[in-house]
Amino acid sequence: MTEVKSGLPLVSVLISSYNHADFIEASIRSVYAQDYPNIELLVVDDGSRDDSVAVIRRLQEELGFHFLPQANKGLCTTLNEMIARSAGLYIAPLGSDDLMLPERLSLQIAFMEQHPETGICAGGIVLIDGESKLLPDKKQRYRPARRLDFDDLFMDRKPGPPAPTLLFRREALEKVGGFDPSIRIEDYYVELRIAHAGYFIDILEESLALYRVHGNNTYKNRRLMIETELEIYKRFEDHPGYEATRLRYLNAMFAKVASEDRALASELLTQIPWRSRNLKTLKGLWRYCFTRAA
């Protein structure tokens, strides 16, 4: 793919594969189905325990992309190492269970080339299940195009960019030092840092990727997720909207976990002052008092 001399900027697509033997082939082939002509594909298997390596090696022999199997290092470290080895002016991480739609990169690059102030370009997603069937329309997420600055993202004024569609300007990623291995919610934190550095995040209205919803990609450790999100907010505690953002999140998470983890719900509730409680708090209290935890 990198032999093409199109005059268009090179895009480095990075796939960090982990235990997705059933899905990785579709992800890789979706990269080769792009109508954008100047792409390099780097694939790393990050210590999978299934047949992912065998599947990827077979595809590598057929298609000729860069492939490296390794012991598990974690997603952020792996992505940073892949970025260092890549050559593209634009970086497109792709989940090893997700798929690019054919016009994705051509639409994003056309936009990014016209908007040097944009550090990240994203777009809509279409939800599919583990068998690649579309989820019902009521579960799909159709949203208009939008531009986000730091305040929009940090204070949740507008819906953020769908992770399966993120395209980074290399310059922006390098300016903030890449992904932070100490933060588990890697996409949200790097988005905030890039926006904080003065770049915009633009989300196109077009659907650009198929996002696979299946049993192995749900975030099961709710406590760790909440602690990580609060740690991300704390790294921007000098922002005037920090306390409002933190309290809004605590209220929302209390309502969400009240019926499933009473101990965690109690801890969250103690962090919400009476004056900052709202309808979500009341909803959570109802669930806490009248719903039996699973």
Regions found by a protein language model. Give the residues of each.
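Glycine-rich, basic loop-to-helix element that forms the pyrophosphate-binding segment
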Residues: 70-86, 107
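Conserved donor NDP-sugar-binding/catalytic core segment of glycosyltransferases
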Residues: 103-136
